[in-house]
């Protein structure tokens, strides 16, 4: 079990460090900034690379909504859920702490003012989208993500391609929803940066736990009841 938890911790660290790091350090860099598309690709690449690296150890969840969604879909034991979630949150926080340390080396850096890649709705949405818009996009995309994960890892799916499908799905999810919520679909990712933003991000954090997890459960149940092929 320790190896599984370590894999989830390292995998989530990589996701937050790579994905949020691209948003904090590279997205707005003068003239050469990578923009929304670059950040979306970075998140997808973090999952793709770590799924290949440690997916064979832990399953490569790196996300509490994925762990709980896989449990809802009958693919993951309930007794391991809490341990996985804790490992994911710890890995994310360590990554965010290192990002904060790096970003603080630039004169004028202010995590509270910049948002530090935090997720938000209403006045804290990158595009000014309402709480209802945030609810719909996070719910639908979290459910869709779990559908992709269940399908790509199904025993009838082509072997060896799951990390590619899942990484591309996460890229697509970010391309759709960065303007709406800055894209969560992952409570561990949201928690990690919210701690260092320290203000409104913590006040809205509950939303980015509840909605992605509910969406993940919906996705898991849809695949289990309607799409999964029975022997």
Curated annotation (Swiss-Prot):
Stimuli inducing this protein: By extracellular hypoosmotic conditions, especially during the mid-logarithmic phase of growth.
Alphabetized SUPFAM superfamilies for the sequence: Aquaporin-like
Pfam families, A to Z: MIP
UniProt keyword annotations, A-Z: Cell inner membrane, Cell membrane, Membrane, Repeat, Transmembrane, Transmembrane helix, Transport
Gene Ontology cellular component annotations, sorted alphabetically: plasma membrane
Disulphide linkage map: none
NPA 1 (motif): residue ranges: 63-65
Transmembrane segments: 9-29, 34-54, 82-102, 131-151, 156-176, 202-222
Keyword Repeat: yes
Residue numbers marked as site, Selectivity filter: 43, 174, 183, 189
Stretches in topological domain Cytoplasmic: 1-8, 55-81, 152-155, 223-231
NPA 2 (motif): residue ranges: 186-188
Signal peptide: none
Record-linked NCBIfam families: MIP (TIGR00861), PRK05420.1 (NF003838)
Protein function: Channel that permits osmotically driven movement of water in both directions. It is involved in the osmoregulation and in the maintenance of cell turgor during volume expansion in rapidly growing cells. It mediates rapid entry or exit of water in response to abrupt changes in osmolarity.
UniProt xrefs under HAMAP family: Aquaporin_Z (MF_01146)
Protein name (database record): Aquaporin Z
Organism: Escherichia coli (strain K12)
